[in-house]
């Protein structure tokens, strides 16, 4: 506790020191430190607009220095602090370049550009009569920039039309029930928005490519927009253009047009020995499996049956961009290949329909790996060391099965101990190393649903996996020794890109505790039934269901996102129901397995995290966790391993795990 208070005092003193430095101390005469941008939208007029102040702030060309928690000018203060010191010192350079931030000075040219960008942004979002007036409020050596924005009324869509250069393409819209084509996002009443128009172009292009039009690109969609309509309305005509082919004949460029045609898959070729460097390898053997042609050296690296379950285009299918992308994602999810490329080649025509060969080139990753890790720890003055060896096999049975075997161990010297009441306990093992842990974990992950119903498939579900694991662990503490055996069988799957569902019908644990006499006496003296039951031998036979969701955008590392997880666990209820028919031993209302009362409870928890991205390497995270467990008839308390606690790397890090 003393260490924490000391650390907090240092942080407060550092912030005070940084703030005490005059922010404008290094601002040259005639320059002004930009302290604030203020955007005034429509003054006091009650003109409704969907434009937010944050959205407008993002387009400004000049922004003030960042502030810690939005209040403290920390980064500028650090820069000022380091600027007057020896620049050759590494620590000074680190403070100035990595932590600090140079003062942002006012530039009139950027103020003008910001006003232009605001006007452009408003025009792009349907405010064609927008007006922006700027003012610079100068005070001594600092300045505030004020933007007075009059958005005007929004322009809304009155009428939407379509125009086609090819009647065959038109047939995909007229009377077509395809949701991607029939339900356009653009409709009467929509506010003019260039971003939405671009998204509509992308969505329509994808929809047509999924229908077999592999030559169709975004450039083949253009918009004719008429804003000269009374009442703040506009009309749109979406034009679908044919292919443009440019040729040069006798030095003269000529452009010819051709209609877009649906393409069909003539065949699928899987090359499991593709050479990334372009060098030709040995002669490959060819094998046909379910209409797919496989090329490999003698025995295929991964069984064709496993690859087939991850291919979603077959001979005779129409080309589909979504199915091609899904195929790539599923093969990538196997974790067996380090290079994946899917290409299409023209293969003539069949009954007037253009044909494509789909070629899947794969280059395998190293099959086996061995890693060694070691770490030193210092938790509240308790020194320790831990090590682990991890063996990985990415293709154990030639079906992309991931096998992991981990052996680990750790030692720690706990020089103090706390009793149940929070007082210092003098009963400690007088050895240099009085805390240890060692064990082993074995897991096998199969990229499929093991034991699924015959003939049943879930093609829309992403990355179906079955995980089987076994763990053995022994912990030694000053108060007790603990032995754990755990085995788990679970399925995981993704319904969408951003969520995951986990179902574990089997999660069995056996925990044995060997308590010291002094610790046993402490438990008995506490008369706390909850603690006594928690620190006793127990058997857990659980079933678990969990769902998680995240809005993280992996294409935009600077975008804020959130994550939440819901979990429900039920233990011992089925076992309790069959205990009497099975004639299990009963003691004091609890049924026993080998003299141990098995756990019976229901438990639910919820976790929420909000990530505020500061830079590419730092973020501010808010975490909320709530849970509830209800012990049932067979046992009066939750087992120690399944009880709720705080502290540790996944909780409040200032305290050790289970210290709160």
Which positions does each model-derived feature cover?
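Flexible glycine-/small-residue-rich
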Residues: 43, 147-153, 164-166, 238-244, ...
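Short small-residue beta-strand/loop micro-motif enriched in glycine and branched aliphatics
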Residues: 156-159, 368-372, 589-591
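C-terminal outer-membrane beta-barrel translocator/porin domains of Gram-negative envelope proteins
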Residues: 281-283, 293, 377-380, 502-660
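C-terminal motif of bacterial Sec signal peptides marking the signal peptidase cleavage site
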Residues: 17-20
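Gram-negative/organellar outer-membrane beta-barrel architecture
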Residues: 300-301, 320-565, 653-654
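Amphipathic hydrophobic-ligand
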Residues: 127-131, 214-218, 383-387, 438, ...
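Sec-dependent N-terminal signal peptides
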Residues: 5-14
């Amino acid at each position: 506790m003393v260490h924490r208070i000391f650390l907090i005092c240092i942080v407060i003193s550092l912030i005070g020191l940084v703030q005490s430095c005059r922010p404008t101390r290094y601002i040259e005469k005639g320059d002004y430190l930009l302290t604030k941008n203020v955007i005034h939208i429509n003054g006091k007029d009650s003109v409704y607009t969907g434009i937010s102040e944050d959205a407008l702030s993002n387009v400004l060309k000049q922004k003030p220095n960042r502030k810690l928690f939005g209040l403290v000018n920390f980064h500028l203060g650090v820069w000022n602090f380091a600027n007057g010191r020896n620049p050759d010192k590494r620590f000074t350079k680190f403070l100035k370049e990595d932590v600090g931030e140079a003062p942002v000075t006012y530039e009139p040219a950027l103020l003008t550009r910001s006003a232009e960008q605001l006007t452009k942004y408003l025009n792009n979002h349907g405010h064609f009569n927008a007006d922006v007036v700027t003012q610079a409020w100068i005070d001594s050596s600092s300045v505030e920039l004020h933007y007075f924005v009059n958005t005007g009324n929004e322009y809304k869509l009155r009428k939407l039309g379509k125009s086609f250069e090819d009647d065959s393409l038109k047939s995909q819209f007229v009377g077509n029930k395809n949701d991607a084509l029939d339900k356009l996002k653009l409709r009467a009443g929509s506010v003019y928005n260039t971003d939405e128009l671009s998204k509509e172009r992308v969505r329509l292009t994808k929809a047509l490519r999924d229908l077999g039009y592999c030559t169709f690109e975004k450039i083949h969609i253009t918009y004719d927009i008429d804003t000269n309509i009374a009442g703040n309305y506009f009309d749109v005509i979406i034009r679908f253009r044919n292919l443009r082919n440019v040729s040069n004949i006798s030095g003269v460029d000529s452009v010819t047009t051709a209609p877009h045609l649906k393409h069909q898959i003539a065949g699928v070729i899987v090359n499991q020995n593709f050479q990334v460097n372009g060098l030709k390898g040995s002669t490959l053997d060819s094998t046909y499996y379910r209409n797919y042609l496989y090329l490999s050296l003698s025995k295929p690296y991964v069984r064709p049956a496993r690859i087939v379950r991850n291919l979603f285009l077959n001979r005779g299918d129409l080309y589909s961009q979504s199915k091609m992308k899904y195929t790539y994602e599923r093969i990538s999810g196997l974790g067996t290949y380090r290079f994946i490329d899917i290409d299409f080649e023209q293969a003539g025509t069949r009954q007037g329909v253009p044909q494509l060969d789909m070629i899947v080139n794969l280059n395998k990753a190293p099959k086996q790996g061995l890693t060694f890790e070691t770490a030193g720890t210092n938790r509240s003055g308790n020194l320790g060391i831990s090590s682990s060896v991890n063996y990985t096999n990415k293709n154990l049975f030639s079906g992309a099965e991931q096998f992991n075997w981990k052996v680990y161990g750790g030692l720690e010297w706990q020089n103090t101990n706390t009793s149940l009441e929070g007082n210092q306990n003098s009963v400690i093992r007088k050895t240099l190393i009085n805390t240890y842990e060692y064990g082993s974990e074995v897991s096998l992950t199969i990229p499929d649903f093991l034991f699924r119903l015959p003939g049943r498939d879930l093609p829309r579900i992403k990355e179906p996996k079955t995980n089987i694991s076994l763990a053995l662990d022994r912990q030694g503490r000053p108060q007790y020794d603990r032995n754990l055996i755990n085995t788990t069988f679970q399925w995981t799957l993704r319904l969408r890109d951003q969520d995951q569902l986990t179902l574990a019908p089997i999660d069995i644990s056996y925990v044995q505790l060997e308590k010291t006499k002094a610790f046993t006496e402490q438990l008995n003296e506490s008369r706390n039934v909850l603690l006594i039951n928690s620190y006793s031998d127990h058997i857990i036979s659980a079933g678990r269901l969990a769902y998680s969701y995240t809005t993280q955008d992996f294409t935009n590392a600077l975008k804020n996102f959130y994550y939440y997880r819901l979990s429900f666990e039920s233990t011992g209820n089925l076992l309790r129901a069959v205990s009497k028919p099975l004639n299990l031993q009963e003691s004091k209302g609890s049924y026993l397995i080998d003299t141990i009362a098995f756990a019976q409870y229901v438990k639910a928890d919820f976790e929420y995290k909000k990530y505020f991205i500061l830079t590419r390497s730092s973020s501010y995270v808010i975490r909320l966790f709530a849970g509830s467990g209800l012990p049932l008839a067979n046992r009066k308390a939750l087992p120690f391993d399944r009880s709720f606690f705080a502290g540790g790397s996944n909780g409040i890090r200032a305290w050790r795990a289970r210290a709160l």
